[in-house]
Amino acid sequence: MNSVQTPSPELTPEVESKTGQYSVTLISLGLFSYCLYWLQQNESSQQMWLMLIGGFLGLALYHASFGFTTAWRNLIVNRRGRGLRAQMVMLAVAVCLFFPALSSAELFGEEVRGYIRPLGYSVLVGAFIFGIGMQLGNGCASGNLYHAGGGQLRAIPSMFGFMVGGLWATADYEWWTGLPQFAPVSVIEETGLIPAIMINLALFAGIALFTIWLEKRTHGEVEKDQPLSEIANWRRYLQGPWPFIWGALVLAILNFATLAMTGRPWAVAVAYPLWGAKLAMLLELELELDFWSYWLQPGRETALEESLTSDVNSVMNAGVLLGAFAAAAMAGKFSFQWRLPILHWIAALLGGVMLGYGATIAFGCNIGAYFGGIASGSLHGWLWLIAAFAGSIVGSYIRPLFKLDTKTSTRSAC
């Protein structure tokens, strides 16, 4: 008697792709959930909530392709300002949320303070160096995190360089901050709450209108954001892509949530020198960090002794990375991308060193100094923006030395 064998059904490429997507999504969400649980059990509920906020920041950055590096280069090279206009919306929402709370120095019964820093050479030079590093490293402080979370391993040398540059800058920090500088200026204190809001909104509108004028003059029309009619169903919330405006709103709201949770705005770059110092200690490098003025400031000396899971900025950065991992998985776009020409790897490492050094002496990066500084009403945030944008102009035009494209896609990424 002949037995008839029924051929086993073969999975179509579409089914295999869906299966892989679901598997990676489960892994990413499982890992994120475990980290949240571990923090709640071993650190505190606040650390758990901060990682969750970081996760949503990573999700928003990834799905909206919301960034600073490519958005600025898009304006510099292509005369397209959609990304920069989205940043102005983000800042406008932020000042409307932040300024009233910072004016009263209280939010939900807890003390809050902004980033009000001096205006001097350290900000001017540091931000300029950072701007060049953005373009060479193909990312900023937050961009490297969400690139790495999405599987783009090109972010790794840039992040390593960021740690090295940040640690290097802590050795020179006393010299830079000892240079002549103007005292910190808070627009809220100088003008009052309502005038401060109106002045900033007028500046944001002016920048947005300038990009529209420049874009129309160059292209005859303005590049539009993704219309809401294309957001077909609830899946788009989880799988993306999002319009830029969604990313702008979510980032502003979550930065405000960070202010409520920690008493100060979101920051990213400040974690990198700490990671570099921890690595140096692990490698038993004799750097005598205890004698560097940077590490003698309140909170920083204890950060060297404590676990990274106790550090607010490190926990939020890890959340951004894990959130981007989950976002890429849900979008079906997660894959390891590491095949790059050697010059690209060199540019990423060099750019990372410039990012770390520049951010540390300039009191922050695109998040802490630009976003957080302007949202705090500090004039140093505007000085940082001008200097970093000038650096990005230089960086954009030296990219070809490393065989990096100067043209950008229609979607902005950090």
Residue ranges of model-derived segments:
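Membrane-interfacial helix-loop segments of redox and metal-homeostasis proteins
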Residues: 2-414
